């Protein structure tokens, strides 16, 4: 049975060695990179199952590296590993498309557990279903793709899952907690503003295709819904 692969981008040798040992004990195949640019080169040819990414790299910002990796592989699970713990940094990472965020100092066992959680989330939403049209949207679950006015949207995994959830119940008002429970397997580890951040980026991507329509409604004090289509 082929082992699941983890790419670890971390320039602190001690941290990298500890994580490699723990991840290998958990059965993962691990490849370590001290810099970000070699990761981009390799990602053009292959993709890991999970990426663990330090924000403070010597050759490229971890945030910028994440952007470029997700442009190549939109469904790539990304876990940020960093000394930064301020809310603005967490929100920036989530807005870029990262899935989770662990601040140093951390427990290596916690990192391994979060990697397992990310993989469960991927598998949970990987069951294919027929392509369906909903108003001006087209939902292609096997390809993890949604089109708007016949134009494919470049979505991160959680943007895709959020929009898919709204698409399947047009007109229904979803609270933030309901959306977190539906999309994030471990909703208790998800920040309240995570949903707002992803909705904001979704709206921007929809507006870039058709600035005259705004299909996602905000219901103050209640949550979000998709307009009846």
UniProtKB/Swiss-Prot annotation:
Its main location: cytoplasm. The keyword NAD does not apply. Phosphorylated by CreC. GO terms for biological process: positive regulation of DNA-templated transcription; regulation of DNA-templated transcription. GO terms for molecular function: cis-regulatory region sequence-specific DNA binding; identical protein binding; phosphorelay response regulator activity; transcription cis-regulatory region binding. It holds the Pfam family Trans_reg_C. Residues 5-119 form the Response regulatory domain. Residues 129-228 bind DNA. Coiled coil: none annotated. One of its GO terms (cellular component) is cytosol. Keywords: Cytoplasm, DNA-binding, Phosphoprotein, Transcription, Transcription regulation, Two-component regulatory system. It comes from the Bacteria. PROSITE patterns: OMPR_PHOB, RESPONSE_REGULATORY. The modification 4-aspartylphosphate is found at residue 54. CDD domains: REC_OmpR, trans_reg_C. It is found in: Cytoplasm. The keyword DNA-binding applies. Member of the two-component regulatory system CreC/CreB involved in catabolic regulation. This is Transcriptional regulatory protein CreB. It comes from Escherichia coli (strain K12). The lineage of its organism: Bacteria, Pseudomonadati, Pseudomonadota, Gammaproteobacteria, Enterobacterales.
